[in-house]
Amino acid sequence: MSSLRVLYWLAKNLIVVPLLRLLFRYEVHGVHNIPKKGAAIMASNHMALLDSAFVPGAIPRHVAFLGKEQLFAGKSLQARVVRGFMKAMGQLEIDRSGGIASASSLGGGADVLRAGKLLGIYPEGTRSPDGRLHRGRTGIARLLLDTPVPVIPVAISGSEEVLPRGAKFLKVGKRVIVTFGEPMDFSRYAGLTEDRFVLRAITDEIMHEIGRLSGQEYVDVYASNARRTVAAKSA
């Protein structure tokens, strides 16, 4: 076992998960839907920064989540703590600027899948600014067509109340629920990597299943665009 895997196991099982269960009403459902071996994509909604602890903490196996590059940047003490936490929890840095840089980042995710491991993705690309479920980015579909594996839809609820936007302290005692749905198979789309309609259809089907599990209202708008709208209204 590599030193990084040892660090992940120690951080998760001896520190993170015990703290989550101590501080919050942390519930996990549907763990039997996670394959005990082999590659799969864990596709989750994204409500709060601490999803990066609650979701991996609920998964028995090691899982590498794709995280935005800003979480790995900065030289301040706070930035270093966040960066260390993200790496300890198995996060992989992803460039969301588009083009070659984004494709290269997704390539790192494909390597994880080819190695027979679990890869975690937030298809919305960023946290929901309003509690609703937003239009998914098609990067997840590209990964699926390049490296066909099952998709496990994941729904988290309550994490947005643990550390609301702008809050400085955690709200202890809040209920947080993580639910894993049944595996989804997209092998019927094999060979259609360049078909943008297929990419959108796969992504929308995944988002629909996440929404069914989470009970969130779905809006066909990217979360990043919705965030700008919310910011403009509050300005």
Ranges and model annotations:
Residues 30, 45, 67-68, 122-124, ...:
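A secondary-structure boundary/capping signal
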Residues 2-23, 74-90, 169-173:
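Alpha-helical membrane-targeting segments
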Residues 18, 32-33, 55-57, 83-84, ...:
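Short secondary-structure boundary/capping segments
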Residues 2-3, 7, 103-235:
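Non-catalytic C-terminal accessory region of glycerolipid acyltransferases
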Residues 21-28, 101-103, 160-163:
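Short gly/ser/thr-rich secondary-structure transition/capping motifs
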Residues 14-46:
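Helix-to-loop junction immediately C-terminal to a conserved catalytic motif
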Residues 14, 26-31, 51-52, 79, ...:
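A generic local structural motif
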Residues 34-99:
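Catalytic core of membrane glycerolipid acyltransferases/transacylases, capturing the structured
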